[in-house]
């Protein structure tokens, strides 16, 4: 039995707490919100972020970040991407040298345009960084439905250890050493899912959505390779698998955001209605900026950035993108 700390009391952090508790580990879950701690400890459910899903018995929640970090065999971070640097900066003093820290956040940091494992490497230099990614809706994980994910770690021994500790017959882990690829897959599936949702909201048809998703995967591969990732990663669970799930489901916050935008709603209005973070909305700008600096052609991402961040008309950008589809008329 391992002593595990989970940093982040949202839906995914809670779901992973269930996975680890079912594996008979001692699990301490840190949440920023006092009401989340009270609900988990008192009612056995995260009423704020994962309502109506009873969580595994024996999970303890706390608002004390230092208690969550000190003396743990390994940690999982599941906080929104834009808060990761601040939270992990507070963890540094209490983290033992060589402690594995697994990033579960799927985003890119605004301003620095850093991927999540890059943020962890900067804020927690004493940690062994890993990434958990793949097709994994939190509600299904918490409900103990089958799931397959990728655990990426450059240290093969630590990666094997983490896979043994986390995996089960219902939560299957595929190991990888491509930390960058796993992180890029988690970012890009959110970006492309917004585009897929826009196509649905604009009633462009299933053919157009399939085209968007396929060409979006090509953008993901080009971007990942430019960042140093392995191309094969994007044909597995952390790439194609996660993209298939997210871009085709209205249960995805990113796809449903795209649908709302396609129906003519304004981005600030949609985001204001949501308690949980829609990571893709904050990732588009960073991916577009990185693509420009790396010289990577990413027309879907560029069109999204124009609409979400620069006030461009949606139909104009759709027409411009369609003119770029291979084989389209000039």
Region annotations inferred by a language model:
Residues 55, 62-146, 162-164:
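Rossmann-like NAD(P)(H) cofactor-binding subdomain of soluble oxidoreductases
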Residues 103, 128-133, 173-177, 236, ...:
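General beta-strand structural signal in soluble alpha/beta enzymes
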């Amino acid at each position: 039995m391992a002593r595990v700390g989970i940093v982040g009391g949202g839906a995914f952090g809670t779901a992973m707490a269930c996975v680890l508790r079912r594996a008979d580990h001692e699990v301490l879950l840190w949440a920023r919100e006092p009401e989340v701690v009270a609900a988990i400890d008192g009612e056995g459910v995260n009423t704020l972020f994962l309502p109506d899903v009873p969580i595994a018995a024996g999970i303890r929640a706390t608002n004390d970040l230092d208690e969550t970090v000190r003396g743990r065999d390994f940690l999982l971070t599941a906080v929104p991407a834009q808060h990761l640097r601040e939270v992990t900066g507070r963890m540094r003093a209490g983290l033992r040298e060589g402690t594995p820290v697994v990033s579960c956040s799927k985003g890119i940091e605004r301003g620095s345009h850093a991927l999540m494992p890059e943020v962890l490497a900067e804020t927690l230099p004493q940690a062994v960084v890993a990434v958990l990614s793949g097709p994994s809706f939190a509600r299904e994980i918490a409900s103990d439905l089958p799931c397959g994910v990728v655990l990426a770690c450059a240290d093969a021994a630590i990666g094997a250890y983490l896979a043994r500790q986390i995996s089960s017959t219902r939560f299957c882990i595929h190991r990888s050493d491509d930390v960058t690829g796993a992180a890029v897959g988690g970012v890009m599936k959110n970006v492309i899912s917004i585009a897929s949702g826009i196509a649905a909201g604009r009633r462009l048809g299933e053919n157009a959505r399939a085209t968007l998703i396929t060409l979006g995967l090509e953008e993901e591969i080009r971007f990942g390779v430019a960042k140093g990732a392995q191309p094969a990663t994007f044909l597995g669970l952390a790439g194609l698998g996660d993209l298939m799930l997210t871009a085709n489901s209205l249960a995805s916050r990113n796809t449903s955001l795209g649908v709302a935008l396609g129906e003519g709603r304004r981005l600030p209005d949609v985001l204001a209605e949501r308690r949980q973070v829609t990571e893709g909305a904050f990732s588009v700008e960073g991916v577009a900026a990185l693509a420009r600096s790396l010289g990577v052609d990413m027309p879907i991402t560029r069109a999204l950035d124009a609409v979400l961040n620069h006030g461009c008309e949606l139909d104009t950008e759709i027409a411009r993108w369609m003119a770029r589809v291979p084989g389209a008329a000039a």
